[in-house]
Amino acid sequence: MQQVNKVVLAYSGGVDTSVCIPYLKNEYGISEVVTFVADLGQGEDLELIRKKALNSGASKSIIGNLVSSFVERYAFPAIRANALYLDKYPLSTALARPLIAENLVNIAREINADAVAHGCTGKGNDQVRFDLAINALGPDLKIITPAREWNMSREEAILYGEKFGIPAPVSKKSPYSIDVNLLGRSIEAGILEDPMQEAPEDIFAMTSSINNSPESPLDIEIIFKNGFPVGINNEFLNPVEIIQKANVLAGEYGFGRIDMMEDRVVGIKSREIYETPGLLLLIKAHKELESITLNPDVIDFKGVVEKKWGQLVYQGFWFGPLKESLDAFIASTQTSVNGRVKIRLHKGNAIVIGRISENNSLYREDLATYSQDDVFKHSLAEGFIYMWGMSNKIWAELNSKKID
């Protein structure tokens, strides 16, 4: 490999990325390691993380405020797509990776870096997401992946960092790997690697336990315009505020925990714990509003598109032609997704109890009612059923003769 003199490293302050700084300098002989810290609304003191990078040997450390872009360009499209990987996971971590990769490439261009680097391990999904996004946006840039090459366990990585005076953010006795952004938290490793071991309560931070959540339910209304959430309880909010408020409301009532077996891109199954209260709540409400504003065939086909959309994002193809085409289809369905959805939060549940679309509802009470106001023409049903089932009737007659 041609000698790299300057590299931009995606930096979080965690075990792997912290160890990457001395590793890149000492093992690769790179003179300048510039770190990029993405502000994704994780609520950490990013200035401390920036200083940690500098103290670990980085020549420069850059903080990028990506919160608004993260919500508007990534989270909101996921809501429109009702994105749930394996029908459970709303891609809270996966959505952040292409945005970080995009900024890595942009910074590399600005400072004339030879390469970009990340601290993803060789068995995770994030390595795929970073590499595919970087290759799509900066195919000429080298990608350096120390954690994929050094073959160190998490414990060994901690010890390596300690040799260079880098304190680990986790204890050796409780080595959870936690990723946090505005959309949620992902927790793995430690005792969670036993799929039968119940996740301890102390790993959760965004959601209350069912026992500690309020005894009385809370009813809320979520307002949508063109498929985007725009308000909660008659209060119109900007995109970031929508996510923040949804997180607080759903989290307080214990909604938004996911404990699942996940099929990783690299072919293995992994036990994952997620907290995504606001995003799950908004997807649930959005899907419900579509049930009253979209035609049945559109809903049916959009379900196929949604599944593929979620797979593409999970597998790292955010910047790809199929994803772009699916985006166009989804956007075309959302002009009529306007209205409000009422949800009851209680003891870990979010139960839809109402939905309305003043201008785009396909529900006709005068057709659906069983009261005297019914305008449905019942006499047409017999002819409809005769034609609807004709092919099946012919098949049945033919096969009954064969049996005789």
From Swiss-Prot:
What EC number(s) is this enzyme filed under? 6.3.4.5
**Record's subcellular location:** Cytoplasm
Which sites bind L-aspartate? 121, 125-126
Binding-site list for L-citrulline: 89, 125, 129, 177, 186, 262, 274
Question: Per the UniProt entry, what is one GO biological process?
Answer: L-arginine biosynthetic process
Q: Which UniProt keywords apply?
A: Amino-acid biosynthesis, Arginine biosynthesis, ATP-binding, Cytoplasm, Ligase, Nucleotide-binding
Binding residues for ATP, per the UniProt record? 10-18, 38, 119
Name the Gene Ontology molecular function terms of this record: argininosuccinate synthase activity; ATP binding
Q: Name the enzyme's class.
A: ligase
InterPro entries the UniProt entry points to: Arginosuc_syn_C, Arginosuc_syn_N, Arginosuc_synth, Arginosuc_synth_CS, Arginosuc_synth_type_1_subfam, AS_cat/multimer_dom_body, Rossmann-like_a/b/a_fold
**Which Gene Ontology cellular component annotation is one that this UniProt entry carries?**
cytoplasm
Q: In which pathway does it act?
A: Amino-acid biosynthesis; L-arginine biosynthesis; L-arginine from L-ornithine and carbamoyl phosphate: step 2/3
Pfam families given for it?
Arginosuc_syn_C, Arginosuc_synth
Which reaction equations make up its catalytic activity? Answer: L-citrulline + L-aspartate + ATP = 2-(N(omega)-L-arginino)succinate + AMP + diphosphate + H(+)
First-listed, main subcellular location of the protein, grouped into a coarse class: cytoplasm
Q: What superkingdom does the record give? A: Bacteria
Q: Which SUPFAM superfamilies match?
A: Adenine nucleotide alpha hydrolases-like, Argininosuccinate synthetase, C-terminal domain
Q: What interactions and quaternary structure are annotated?
A: Homotetramer.
Q: Which family does it belong to?
A: Belongs to the argininosuccinate synthase family. Type 1 subfamily.
Report what the protein is called.
Argininosuccinate synthase
Protein's gene? argG
